[in-house]
Amino acid sequence: MKTTPFFANLLASQTRELTENELEMTAGGTASQQSPVQEVPEQPFATMRYPSDSDEDGFNFPV
């Protein structure tokens, strides 16, 4: 009995032909029932602080 890897079966089960409407959406066209993507306001990234040997807050970390 020949066995096929699990992920190969999973991938094969997930593939199917796209409909005309789905092709239109993936190609960047306008599909009638698809709502437009809302713009997300840009927010700056939070920076992570790393502790140093003698921190400004008075904590001393062992070297």
From Swiss-Prot:
Disulfide topology: none
Biased composition (Acidic residues): 53-63
UniProt biased composition (Low complexity): 32-44
One annotated GO molecular function: serine-type endopeptidase inhibitor activity
Signal peptide: 1-29
Site for Reactive bond, residues: M48, R49
Keyword tags: Protease inhibitor, Pyrrolidone carboxylic acid, Serine protease inhibitor, Signal
Pfam families: Inhibitor_I10
InterPro entries (UniProt xref): Prot_inh_I10_marinostatin
Region (Disordered): 23-63
Coiled-coil zones: none
Modified residues (Pyrrolidone carboxylic acid): Q43
Function summary: Inhibits subtilisin, chymotrypsin, and elastase, but not trypsin.
Family: Belongs to the protease inhibitor I10 family.
This protein's name: Marinostatin-L
